[in-house]
Regions:
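Glycine- and charge-enriched low-complexity intrinsically disordered segments
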Residues: 136-167
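Single-pass alpha-helical membrane anchors
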Residues: 1-22
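Short alpha-helix capping/helix-loop boundary micro-motifs
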Residues: 93-100
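Short, compositionally biased
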Residues: 117-140
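Extended boundary segments
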Residues: 26-29, 33-82
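Short, basic/aromatic beta-hairpin or loop at an interaction surface
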Residues: 77-93
Length: 167
């Protein structure tokens, strides 16, 4: 019985995530539509990532992008000290204050370059991602990676709840 409930929870969560992405899966060019720039990867209105520190390629708090944003800064993530050290070692120092930039510290939310976020994950530096503030313009392959990590976290939480109810 518990297995059936657990499987149903998984299927509901997957269908929720996939509901908004079927079009992009079959038509990847649909993500180039300028109207998608204001939606998140869940298909709803893009929420603000951070105003303290002020983030976003255009420094308006949102992970919006455009042709001038060569790094595609669309992933809203909470950075860790470990991730900041990693990105510094890769040539992108986000922790040192500079002109009009306070420098990031552990726990700050920031619009990350999608490929740098992916490099961090592949090197073991996983950061929490705010799905509601991560832009739908994020590449589908990276979006699926983000969702897989969030699904894993969600399932672990559900499993812990079920364990507590049983024992």
């Amino acid at each position: 019985m518990i297995k059936i409930v657990f499987i149903c929870i998984i299927l509901l969560y997957i269908s929720f995530l996939c509901k908004h992405q079927i079009k992009e899966f079959f038509d990847p060019d649909s993500t180039n539509d300028s109207t998608n720039n204001s939606t998140n990867i869940l298909g709803t209105k893009l929420e603000i990532c951070s105003t303290d520190p002020m983030t976003g390629f255009h420094r308006k708090g949102y992970c919006k992008t455009g042709p001038e944003d060569k790094g595609t800064h669309t992933v809203c993530a909470t950075v860790t000290d470990e991730f900041l050290e990693f990105t510094k070692s890769m040539g992108n120092d986000l922790s040192t204050p500079r002109d009009n930039f306070p420098g990031l510290k552990d726990g700050d939310k920031w619009c990350l370059c999608e490929l740098r976020w992916q490099q961090g994950v592949h090197n073991g530096y996983i950061t929490d991602v705010d799905l509601k503030a991560t832009n739908s313009k994020t590449r589908p392959s990276i979006r699926y990676e983000i969702e897989a990590l969030n699904l894993q976290e969600f399932l672990q939480e559900e499993l812990n709840i079920l364990k507590n109810k049983i024992f």
